[in-house]
Amino acid sequence: MEHQQNHTFSADTGKLLKLMIHSLYSNKEIFLRELVSNAADAADKLRFKALSDGSLFENDGDLRVRLSFDADLKTITISDNGIGMSRDEVIEHLGTIAKSGTSDFFEQLSGDQVKDSQLIGQFGVGFYSSFIVADKVTVNTRKAGEPASQGTCWISTGESDYTVADIEKAGRGTEITLHLRDDETEFLNDYKLRGIVSKYSDHISIPVEMFKEATEESEGSDGEKVPATEATWEAVNKATALWSCSKSELKDEEYKEFYKHIANDFEDPLTWSHNKVEGEQAYTSLLYIPKRAPYDLWNREKAHGLKLYVQRVFVMDDAEQFMPTYLRFVKGVLDSNDLPLNVSREILQDTRVTAKLRSGCTKRVLDLLTKLAKKDDDAYNLFWKEFGQVLKEGPAEDSSNKEKIGKLFRFSSTETDSTEQTVSLDAYISRMTEGQDKIYYITADSFNAAKNSPHLEVLREKGIEVLLLSDRIDEWLLSHLPEYDGKTFTSVTQGDLDLGKLDSEEKKKEQEKQETEFASFVERVKAVLGDKVKDVRLTHRLTSTPSCIVADNDDMSTQMAKLMAQMGQPVPESKPVFELNPEHVMIVKLADMADEDLFAQWSELLLEQAILSEKGSLDDPSEFVGRINKLLLA
């Protein structure tokens, strides 16, 4: 070996190695699945690059993975004749975990072995799983198209460092040799290895081969002669593209294992959809909904999308053009007959075929989720907990599917008064009271703030259901989804609450009478508060609270203004409308108060209380405290 160098693992890589060996030990056979999966990917990449440069095959176009073991040396070797790696690529891919969000990943680890193993699976440990069973790993590799002298050897014990050196390697591709720990000799068994390959890698589209010894001619149980066979490498797996098989040929277990292969996930998927489409565009899609959200779901820079194949030839990972951003959690494969084999990401950006494929895949996912929501509440609620907030991005991005997406939404409401978001818009509409033509909602910082808001008092009294919205995205969502099924979304904290037909004629007459009786009182309060408020008026939305503030119809809602301020965005200046409950004893007493100074202090205090209740804070808390103290002594 020449040009030998020692390198230290990056801190994150060393940390992950120790953690992974501890957390994944109970499922240690997955090391073979990971290494075979990587080898198959290397073959896919070579096949694609060879489309434009046939010399990369080096007169050896039969791509395969080979698996062997040596019981005396206690080694297992996985080799492929795929794309291979250069020295720089070896250092980049094997010396560090070149992934964004690694530190976020570590922050999410809980110390719970089951949960952590699931998270590590989401992260995609790949090659590093070798160290679960091996105390030393040797990698010999040469990149396709490079001379034999340009091979690279990588050696590590999986502790703090690794060695890289130049070697001579006749064949292209990668050979990984695992030097097993003394207590891992169970894997030095032909039957055991064949069983693991069949279990995890049957769906790999290239053959995974193991050596079969020659046999002599013998006599069978029925007396017939069994002919001799020559020693040969034989395929252990089916080696067919799983998505190209008909659904009737496939078992659920095969679908699940294929998902784990393409998604780098240790858990089964929640559900999937396998479809073959013929006609103007011919394509096959196999789309999966994961059971858990990845730790980096909100990292918009992270690549996402489907594995793209053209006529079963791998083209690219993370082809995001075929799935809208609000469905970025979907994993799967798209195999098109209509795209050119030399397709690039740039070509995909703006083609009629791409638009048709994207529309088709989007429809499949929305139909799949609709079906799941109808047949399995528990499974759909699990999906909603993990991905609901991402799905709420849908109406803004995909206006053509607004109603379909809206049907999938789940919220908390006054019907359940639970933090669990289980109420669909269809269920809400089915419970609407006679004469109700609006979907009422409230947005707040938290579920409890929404649930206990005074703005709900009259609606609760009348038995009118209100959606309780406390996700940060909710206010923005409703700006893009103003109505559903012909019913307008109406905020109970914005504008004058017009209950229309829900109020009796008798109640309306009583309200008109109160407007007249309290007119001079309202003017006195306006005079005291001046430009602190946009308007003062009587309210009919309160029953047990003396006052509240609301945003005017044309102004930004309090919650939206708060969110924009938190994000450092400029917020348009607006003042609240101050509403007073004429049936509350405090308001009745205030209306009769002759002392103008006391009247002013109580009016200010009621406004500050209403602001505190709605916004959660005051511009000048000390003034508020001073006012309370003054009134306590009055």
Swiss-Prot record:
Could you tell me which Pfam families the record lists for this protein? HATPase_c_3, HSP90
Cleaved signal peptide residues = none
Chief location category: cytoplasm
Which parts of this chain are annotated as the region C?
Answer: 563-634
Q: Where in the cell is it found?
A: Cytoplasm
InterPro entries to which the protein is assigned, alphabetical: HATPase_C_sf (IPR036890), Heat_shock_protein_90_CS (IPR019805), HSP90_C (IPR037196), Hsp90_fam (IPR001404), Hsp90_N (IPR020575), Ribosomal_Su5_D2-typ_SF (IPR020568)
* Keywords for this protein: ATP-binding, Chaperone, Cytoplasm, Nucleotide-binding, Stress response
Instruction: Quote one Gene Ontology molecular function term.
Output: ATP binding
Q: How does it assemble?
A: Homodimer.
| The family this protein is said to belong to | Belongs to the heat shock protein 90 family.
- Full protein name: Chaperone protein HtpG
Name its species: Psychromonas ingrahamii (strain DSM 17664 / CCUG 51855 / 37)
